[in-house]
Amino acid sequence: MTGSNEFKLNQPPEDGISSVKFSPNTSQFLLVSSWDTSVRLYDVPANSMRLKYQHTGAVLDCAFYDPTHAWSGGLDHQLKMHDLNTDQENLVGTHDAPIRCVEYCPEVNVMATGSWDQTVKLWDPRTPCNAGTFSQPEKVYTLSVSGDRLIVGTAGRRVLVWDLRNMGYVQQRRESSLKYQTRCIRAFLNKQGYVLSSIEGRVAVEYLDPSPEVQKKKYAFKCHRLKENNIEQIYPVNAISFHNIHNTFATGGSDGFVNIWDPFNKKRLCQFHRYPTSIASLAFSNDGTTLAIASSYMYEMDDTEHPEDGIFIRQVTDAETKPKSPCT
């Protein structure tokens, strides 16, 4: 299954994989959260697990604050900060319901968490302590940082754009342009917009500038759909990750495929081989050379027999990730 440009990590989590995140400054270290209640740190080139720490419930997301500190949250409502050098942990705070998302906002130096308790909380990582709680209209399903803005996707297909420097009001209230439940949002690196995916095999490319001439550029497309016995099977698009150098992005779906897209020319650049089961999470390394792919059954068809969960590390090339110059 794996070629010379790809390998599977040893000692994978023992249950579903919820999130994979590369260290901010190296493709050597990968943080992985899991339903087995663990957060694991892998040394990728050595293909070994460096460290593991536990929550008391499934961990739904994790993030690096800096190269030596991991943050994580999940079903136990607890937000933890773990020092990866000393193996010391700190219970930073809690939500009133499971924590679904954990993200670092480097431009304003805060951690943001989104929860099913219908709030986003900001945390000062230096102290560490709570720096504010902000009500959302519904359960938070996904969030993404765009410079000093925070884009929050909730139940009810709502999207809220917050200014992290002034959280006194919501900067923009939007509705998803897709008809079905939002699964993932990731911001463009140029801070001009975001990509949103749904459970119904679609992806939308949206722009933050509300002016009509910019809004004309937005579009949506179908993906992660397979014809089987002349019937189109439609799969959730669970994961999105941007390539830091080329501004292209990868999507992962419950069909087990990873696609890479050029949003500027509206083209698919490539599709990798089919992975054993659903793609639950994706992460490009900061330098864009490596893609971590979590192949992990997400119980779309209830508790049936399924392939074991695994993390694949793939070396990617410019041919796979760089936009093609449009024909003139």
From Swiss-Prot:
There is a cross-link at K216 (Glycyl lysine isopeptide (Lys-Gly) (interchain with G-Cter in ubiquitin)). GO terms for cellular component: kinetochore; nucleus. The keyword Cell division applies. Poly-ADP-ribosylated by PARP1. Ubiquitinated by UBR5, promoting disassembly of the mitotic checkpoint complex from the APC/C complex. Pfam families: WD40. The modification N6-acetyllysine is found at K179. Its main location: nucleus. It is found in: Nucleus; Chromosome, Centromere, Kinetochore. Has a dual function in spindle-assembly checkpoint signaling and in promoting the establishment of correct kinetochore-microtubule (K-MT) attachments. Promotes the formation of stable end-on bipolar attachments. Necessary for kinetochore localization of BUB1. Regulates chromosome segregation during oocyte meiosis. The BUB1/BUB3 complex plays a role in the inhibition of anaphase-promoting complex or cyclosome (APC/C) when spindle-assembly checkpoint is activated and inhibits the ubiquitin ligase activity of APC/C by phosphorylating its activator CDC20. This is Mitotic checkpoint protein BUB3. The lineage of its organism: Eukaryota, Metazoa, Chordata, Craniata, Vertebrata.
